[in-house]
């Protein structure tokens, strides 16, 4: 009975596919896997690959990082802080950046974290919904380094809305230009 319901579900899915859609079939044997760990790990890998593809398709990937992290818990705040620090420091170290704007000391984790918390408050107080705090923080920090003066959140937001993070970074970091 369960096998028939699965076949009916697969047929229904095939009827809903549109041109260009891809159906991925994974056969996961349950033999010698009493706790279904292999199946669960395989499913997790498939779902991770799918979500990575979706994030790339909607432009939420910069270089080899998914930058649209919603800092809602300690683990994600740490990841978001690391992404900010990494992208800012990578850009500050580029030869073209140094030639145009001069040398700057690398941003510390604590500095990136402080800017992230300011971004979280800015997004919350301006009811910006899905605005990415990571992208906003990266742009604000780089604009401040470029101007050698503080940059406002509104300026960073305008740049994010007009260029997106990938476009902004591509202009300032040739390694990320595609």
Model-derived features: positions:
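Glycine-rich phosphate-binding loops that contact phosphosugars or nucleotide phosphates
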Residues: 1-45, 51-58
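Glycine-rich phosphate/diphosphate-binding loops and the adjacent beta-loop-alpha structural elements
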Residues: 30-37, 41, 52-177
């Amino acid at each position: 009975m369960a096998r028939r319901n699965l076949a009916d579900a697969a047929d229904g899915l095939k009827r809903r596919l549109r041109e260009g859609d891809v159906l991925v079939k994974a056969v996961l044997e349950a033999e010698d896997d009493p706790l279904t760990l292999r199946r669960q790990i395989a499913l997790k890998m498939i779902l991770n690959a799918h979500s990575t593809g979706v994030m790339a398709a909607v432009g939420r990937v910069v270089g080899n990082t998914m930058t649209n992290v919603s800092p809602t818990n300690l683990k994600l705040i740490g990841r978001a802080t690391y992404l900010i620090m990494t992208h800012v420091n990578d850009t500050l170290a580029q030869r073209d950046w140094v030639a145009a704007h001069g040398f700057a000391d690398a941003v510390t984790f604590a500095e990136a974290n402080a800017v992230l918390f300011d971004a979280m408050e800015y997004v919350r107080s301006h009811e910006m919904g899905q605005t990415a705090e990571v992208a906003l923080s990266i742009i604000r920090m780089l604009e401040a380094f470029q101007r050698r003066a503080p940059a406002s959140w509104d300026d960073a937001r305008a740049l994010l809305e007009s260029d997106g993070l990938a476009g902004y970074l591509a202009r300032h970091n040739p390694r990320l230009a595609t």
